[in-house]
UniProtKB/Swiss-Prot annotation:
One GO term of the biological process aspect: negative regulation of DNA recombination
Keywords: ATP-binding, DNA-binding, Endonuclease, Hydrolase, Nuclease, Nucleotide-binding, RNA-binding, rRNA-binding
NCBIfam families documented for this protein: mutS2
Protein EC: 3.1.-.-, 3.6.4.-
UniProt entry tagged with the keyword RNA-binding: yes
Subunit organization: Homodimer. Binds to stalled ribosomes, contacting rRNA.
Protein name: Endonuclease MutS2
Family: Belongs to the DNA mismatch repair MutS family. MutS2 subfamily.
Function field: Endonuclease that is involved in the suppression of homologous recombination and thus may have a key role in the control of bacterial genetic diversity. Acts as a ribosome collision sensor, splitting the ribosome into its 2 subunits. Detects stalled/collided 70S ribosomes which it binds and splits by an ATP-hydrolysis driven conformational change. Acts upstream of the ribosome quality control system (RQC), a ribosome-associated complex that mediates the extraction of incompletely synthesized nascent chains from stalled ribosomes and their subsequent degradation. Probably generates substrates for RQC.
Domain Smr: 710-785
Enzyme class, first EC level, given as a word: hydrolase
Binding residue positions for ATP: 333-340
GO molecular function: ATP binding; ATP hydrolysis activity; ATP-dependent DNA damage sensor activity; endonuclease activity; mismatched DNA binding; ribosomal large subunit binding; rRNA binding
């Protein structure tokens, strides 16, 4: 992308804001160098990564990051066998610690946050165990070598502290005792890394030892008394050994780090990438920006787009479209109406999207991925070259014409301005014709009325204007696509009190062609406002319809789940009954087998036959059980079958199998998605029979089979809660509004369980104790939604 467009559209302001939101120095540097990409796949990947961090930031919160220095200079030194200093190793420890913390942070991320797109980055956060362990034991983030780095270092530091205490105690005898009168001040200080006292010059001989320094006046000598010479010598020796031990430790740590140069570089790079992406996510949140959708035909559809550098409380959102029905847009009208800002908004949002940033526009806004974006906006004449505004303008356009192609977005402010209006308009038309032949996407602003007709008589070209409020005599800054702009001079003059005869005379002086154009524009304005009002009404109605459809689908899904639950329960009960009867039948047969060789009384045989016949009848009853029959029928439907959709009470034809248990059914002119539990296959004989008028009596039938009262008295707690759950399901299916739960008073356990269940249920509107004459505290009245 050319640097000029970045400057014209103030892209640097965006990268500055991005860098300010980054935490680490490498990420800030990366933000400052951010440039738009012209590679579609790269842009798509960048936007998806920004989306991943946006979701993570919204759901989980900010990554545990803090600032660290670039590790590349350190790893480069390791590569040439150099040893690192303590500060460099402390920075490496910080980098590894951050990687470890982020790994732990992401361990319990909500499954709703899809981080697949950044897996290659996260895979680099593999912390080398040995290096991390040794660094953590030996050094802190500021580069301070710890006592735990080695046992020798710990011993030396203990000896240093002990010897230092001895020195201070010895020196205290000089500052606190009789010798203090010979001192300039009663203090102990250090010169040349040795402890000394400030002795008055005339009392030098009182102390012996070594003079290390003197004051500027020469009146004070800094003397190391002879009594502490050995202690100071020992201290210096211990300190020298400590420094040597620290060098050994740093060398040891550097050798370990040298084995993990690639890992260190990868981890630092991954942390930088995560911080950079998180900064993008923060910027999106700050700007209330949304994910742009990419188009492969280079079309733009920015919905309620806002210029990101204008005060959010003052900026006016605009719908900006280019591509699709038209590739060239001419924005006409007077100055200060917002034409230039509209151009800059389209261009800057396009640059942001191609940089992997979210854009300040509504969701589902679309942008292309352009190879180049060119702009000629504002007066950029060069004083050094002594060029006029028009010459500078032409130089920019000539440069654009040399490079333009079908993958180019061209933005030109006041095309052809700065010269004779007639010549300028002709030149503007010719330039536009050339750019259109190159299949570029073009947005231009102009004052020339001749270009209003250009928008009508050229294919894939449209006019646009900035709306003007005649009541307030001020621009609204709203873009109107399809309507050319005009000056509104006569209307403004009238509003300001100009004499009517003067205004009318001015109107008569206009050419018929200009007058006709203005009338056409006024008519288009009225039609557009009417169309906008109608569209808003339709969008509102569509939104309501979609929400209603969603609610109905949710209700249908809930209904199917409840029906399935009831069927499963019925099947379970049937299986239990069959198992018990089989067990009893087997027992009877076994008894008969045992007694076949023994004389049996006739009445016993009759009783046994009666029991077997009874079991057979019960089995037959189960075989004819409507619930189980329906269950069986529902599992035997296929594409083309005529079925009855139970939830609608209507018939239709299965047109598609969506999944193992879901089908698409055509009912008249509509198609619905249903579960196999919600359909009954219709035999051909039934489908060819004379159609009957459908009567929706389902609710009435269900109500007749459902009781408005449930008695839980005398039941165990678990049994009562199970029965309560099943009862609520059944009354919901039956459509009852109010029911009574009798739980008694007793210990209160059942009542507490009932109330806890009702509080947690989404289907309960409210509940309270029954009136005194209907059970009082021993019963609860429940109102269902």
């Amino acid at each position: 992308m050319n640097n000029k467009i970045l400057k014209i559209l103030e892209f640097g302001e965006i990268t500055d804001r991005l860098g300010a939101l980054a935490i680490t120095s490498p990420a800030k540097e990366r933000a400052e160098k951010l440039l738009p990409s012209s590679d579609f796949d790269q842009v798509q990947n960048d936007i998806k990564q920004t989306l991943a961090l946006t979701n993570l930031l919204r759901i989980k919160g900010q990554l545990p990051l803090t600032n660290f220095k670039d590790v590349r200079p350190s790893t480069k030194r390791l590569g040439v066998k150099a040893n690192l200093n303590a500060q460099e190793l402390g920075n490496l420890l910080l980098v590894l610690s951050l990687a470890q913390e982020i790994n732990e942070f992401l361990e319990d991320v909500d499954e709703k946050v899809d981080l697949t797109i950044i897996d290659p980055i996260l895979d680099q956060l593999d912390v080398p165990d040995l290096l991390f362990r040794e660094l953590k034991k030996s050094i802190d983030y500021d580069g301070e070598v710890l006592d735990t780095a080695s046992s020798e270092l710990a011993r030396l530091r203990h000896d240093i502290a002990s010897n230092e205490e001895d020195i201070k105690n010895r020196m205290t005898t000089y500052t606190k005792g009789n010798s203090s009168k010979y001192l300039s001040e009663q203090i102990v200080t250090i010169r040349d890394d040795r402890y000394v006292i400030p002795v008055k010059q005339e009392y030098r001989a009182k102390f012996g030892g070594v003079v290390h320094d003197q004051s500027a006046s020469g009146q004070t000598l800094f003397v190391e008394p002879e009594a502490v010479l050995n202690l100071n010598n020992r201290q210096q020796n211990l300190i020298a050994k400590e420094k040597q031990e620290i060098r050994n430790i740093l060398k040891h740590l550097s050798n370990i780090a040298r084995e993990d140069i690639d890992s260190l570089n990868n981890i630092a790079s991954a942390l930088t990438s995560l911080d950079f992406l998180q900064a993008k996510a923060k910027l999106a949140k700050e700007m209330k920006a949304s994910e742009p959708k990419l188009t492969k035909d280079h079309s733009l559809n920015l919905r309620n787009a806002r210029h990101p550098l204008i005060n959010p409380e003052k900026v006016v959102p605009n719908n900006i479209r280019l591509g699709g029905d038209f590739d060239t847009m001419l924005i006409t009208g007077p100055n200060t109406g917002g034409k230039t800002i509209t151009l800059k908004t389209a261009g800057l949002l396009q640059l942001m999207a191609q940089s992997g940033l979210f854009i300040p526009a509504e969701e589902d806004s679309q942008v292309g991925v352009f190879e180049q974006i060119y702009a000629d906006i504002g007066d950029e004449q060069s004083i050094e070259q002594s060029l006029s505004t028009f010459s500078s303008h032409m130089n920019d356009i000539i440069a654009i014409m040399k490079n333009v192609n079908s993958e180019t977005l061209v933005l030109i402010d006041e095309i052809g301005a700065g010269t004779d209006p007639e010549e300028g308009a002709s030149l503007a038309i010719s330039i536009l014709d050339f750019l259109r032949k190159k299949d570029a996407k073009i947005m231009v602003t102009t004052h020339y009325p001749e270009l209003k007709l250009y928008g009508y008589n050229r294919p894939r070209t449209t006019n646009a204007s900035m709306e003007f409020d005649l009541k307030t005599l001020s621009p609204t800054y709203r873009l109107q696509i399809g309507i050319p702009g005009h000056s509104n001079a006569f209307a403004i003059a009238r509003r300001l009190g100009m004499r009517e005869d003067v205004v009318k005379n001015a109107q008569e002086l206009m050419s018929d062609e200009d007058s006709d154009i203005n009338k056409m524009i006024a008519k288009l304005n009225a039609q557009t406002k009417a169309a906008t009002t109608a569209r808003n009404r339709l969008e509102t109605s569509l939104d309501r319809s979609q929400k209603l459809e969603q609610k109905l689908q949710q209700a249908l899904d809930w209904y199917n789940q409840r029906v399935q639950k009831q069927l499963d329960f019925a099947q379970e009960r049937a299986n239990e009954i069959i198992a018990k009867r089989r067990k009893k039948a087997d027992k009877i047969i076994e008894q008969l087998e045992q007694q076949k060789n023994v004389g049996i009384k006739e009445n016993k045989i009759i009783e046994a036959k009666g029991e077997l016949n009874s079991l057979e009848r019960q089995a037959n009853n189960l075989a004819h059980n409507k619930v189980l029959q329906r269950e069986k029928r529902r599992h035997h439907v296929s594409i083309g079958d005529r079925v009855k959709v139970l939830s609608y009470g209507q018939t239709g034809t299965i047109t598609k199998q969506l999944s193992e248990h879901e089908y698409e059914v055509q009912m008249g002119i509509i198609k619905v998605k249903v579960s196999d539990r919600d359909v009954e296959r219709i035999d051909n004989s039934q489908s060819t029979a004379k159609p009957k008028r459908l009567v929706r009596a389902t609710s009435a039938v269900r109500r007749s089979n459902a009781h408005s009262e449930l008695d839980l008295r005398g039941q165990r707690y678990d049994e009562a809660m199970t029965n309560l759950d099943r009862y609520i399901d059944s009354v919901l299916l039956a459509g009852l509004d109010t029911v009574t739960i009798i739980h008694g008073i007793g210990t209160g356990a059942i009542r507490k369980g009932v109330w806890q269940y009702l509080r947690s249920s989404n289907h309960v509107k409210n509940f309270n104790y029954a009136p005194a004459n209907e059970g009082g505290n021993g019963a609860t009245i429940v109102q269902l939604k």
